[in-house]
Amino acid sequence: MRKCIFILLVILAVSYRLEAKKQEVVMPSGKEIYIPKDLQGMDLQNPDSKWSYHRMAYTDNFVIFWEKGFGNDLSNPPQLEVDLLNLTEKLESFYHFFRDTLKFSKPGSKCDKYRMMVMLNYSLEGTAYGGDYDGEIGALWIAPNRVQDKKLNCIAHELGHSFQAQISCDGEGEAWGGCGFFEMTSQWMLWQVNPEWITDEKYHWDAFMKLTHKAYLHLENIYHSPYVLEYWGMKRGLPFIAELYRQGKRGEDPVITYKRMAGLDQKQFCDEMFDAYRHFINWDFPRVWKETRPYANKYTTSLTTLSDGWYGIAPDNCPENYGFNAIPLALPERGKKVKVEFCGEAGKEGYNAIHTDKADWRYGFVAITEDGKSIYGDVSDNSGKSIIFTAPKVNNLTHLWLVVMGAPTEHWMNPNPEEKDAQWPYRIKVTGSKPL
């Protein structure tokens, strides 16, 4: 009897091992699946584990795990539905663009060896964020409420962070610590794969319209304004942005890195930033020309009326370092001249007076013709020169703008959030037109 029981137990044990072996998930061919340190103590072959190969999907470049609460079928979980097909298709599309066009990874990257990782948390309380696992491979941690948008704008943004982190994983770039440029770049990367981003997340554009005067890289604007990066990419090639990350050094901010890579001195950098802002008036970017038509020529600026026909910039939208105002002017008749006299007032009472010995400005006209073309007028600084714009004799104008930018003669890093930014007040006098 005991012998029979022993044999039966042996048979059951062997059967269990065979059944367990049969349930083991075979690893996919192609790129490896990296096992992060915090998962190495977990039995990923066990369906009852929090993370398991039994709740895994993969593409050529990604492995996607979802928590036990979803069950085996993401399209029909107990509560939280995820469109796995759309997620995998969008991930692959974003991946190829970020890698092959923007060049955020290069041949020899660790993402040539490993699939990037996506961890789906079973929660409605969570959000999404991108980064890396163990300094080895880019990763995403997401909750189902962030993958309901069919365009997956949030995922494109966060995958941007994964690719930014991949540069560090690959041993390149000391970068800039917690600089808000990372968020600005992810918004730009999202805009690259979705030209309709401004419309889809119009609240960012609405906010930027009220914050154009803020210093470049100011934390209030980092989610709202990827537009300088669009200009840089147009001017120097899309891969230049990823190269900024590779070339960034400790003790620098993105402006210092950019100037060094582009070979620009401070005056040249200010000239270039002003040119970028002139492009913002009519959104003169060929890649998104069609999509930005509803947003062209929409700026307002708060001025105070002074004596003798002068107008001063109000403190609440006075330009900071590389911040700008776009002042709408009344249209002149064909062939008529508009003259602007400009006077910088660094250190004026009621404004933040910081490094006033470094004060300078850029100002110039931007006119828009009835066929949608931009005319960029001459640019001046605070040398006391007046600027003149002559309206075309042939084409009618639909808009005329005076653009003014704070252009310090020396660059310094943005202050901490609790500290004040330098302001560059000014006044203008307009002849042949008037501010609207």
State where each predicted segment sits:
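Bacterial Sec-dependent N-terminal signal peptides
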Residues: 1-23
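Residues at beta-strand starts and edge strands
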Residues: 6, 60, 114, 336-338, ...
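Zymogen propeptides/activation segments of proteases
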Residues: 21-89, 93, 97-99, 348, ...
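Short, solvent-exposed secondary-structure boundary motifs
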Residues: 38-47, 118-123, 376-382
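Juxtacatalytic substrate-recognition/specificity segment
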Residues: 54-178, 185-186, 196-199
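A signal for specific C-terminal beta-sheet/loop modules enriched in small/flexible residues
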Residues: 71-88, 238-248, 255-261, 419-424
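Acidic/His/Gly-enriched intrinsically disordered linker/tail segments
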Residues: 132-133, 149-154, 169-235, 239-240, ...
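Beta/coil-rich, acidic/histidine-enriched accessory regions frequently appended to metallopeptidases
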Residues: 252-436
